[in-house]
């Protein structure tokens, strides 16, 4: 089964929350504490704190200390893709052992494999879909593009359902 890890899901939720915050001071985006985000969405605070720290280290967030501290976006949400966020939290997205994220393969059966090429197409379709969804799209929910026909067809071949929304 293909699904986002809870960490990636929580990271996307936090970035959406921050993208929707009204601007404060000199910043285009408002800030929120880890506790506020955790309480709003029922996410465990210790886990969310680790995710937010990871997103800050990856350059997606700025951490601000003090009484009005918290996290705010460090980059324009129109330029942050779901794929970048998922990679920052979970590492490379690898559908099967047939190949790595960058096209190599790590399977002893690849010479005789009859599903390698269709799986490669599904893998590429998923990466393409995730790279075309931005935090701004997720925040607006109107801008989510439909998966391209090739990605949908490849996914159907394996009984997967690709939808643009992250529900």
Show which residues each predicted segment covers:
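Alpha-helical residues within the helix-turn-helix
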Residues: 39, 56-57
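Conserved segment of winged-helix/HTH DNA-binding domains
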Residues: 77-102, 115-124
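Beta-hairpin "wing" of winged helix-turn-helix
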Residues: 59-74
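N-terminal helix-turn-helix DNA-binding core of bacterial DNA-binding proteins
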Residues: 2, 6, 12-43
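C-terminal regulatory/oligomerization modules of transcriptional regulators
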Residues: 100-167
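Key DNA-contact positions within bacterial/archaeal DNA-binding proteins
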Residues: 46
């Amino acid at each position: 089964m293909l699904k986002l890890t809870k960490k990636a899901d929580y990271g996307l939720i936090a970035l959406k929350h921050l993208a929707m915050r009204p601007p404060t001071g000199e910043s285009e985006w408002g800030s929120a504490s880890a506790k506020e985000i955790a309480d709003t969405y029922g996410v465990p605070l210790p886990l969310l704190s680790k995710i937010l720290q990871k997103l800050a280290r990856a350059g997606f967030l700025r951490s601000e200390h003090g009484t009005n501290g918290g996290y705010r976006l460090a980059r324009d949400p129109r330029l942050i893709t779901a794929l970048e966020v998922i990679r920052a939290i979970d590492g490379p997205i690898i559908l099967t052992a047939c190949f790595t994220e960058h096209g190599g393969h790590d399977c002893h059966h690849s010479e005789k494999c009859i599903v390698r090429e269709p799986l490669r197409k599904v893998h590429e379709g998923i990466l393409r879909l995730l790279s075309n969804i931005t935090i701004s799209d997720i925040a607006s929910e109107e801008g989510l593009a439909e998966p391209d026909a090739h990605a949908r067809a490849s996914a159907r071949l394996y009984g997967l359902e690709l939808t643009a929304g992250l529900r």
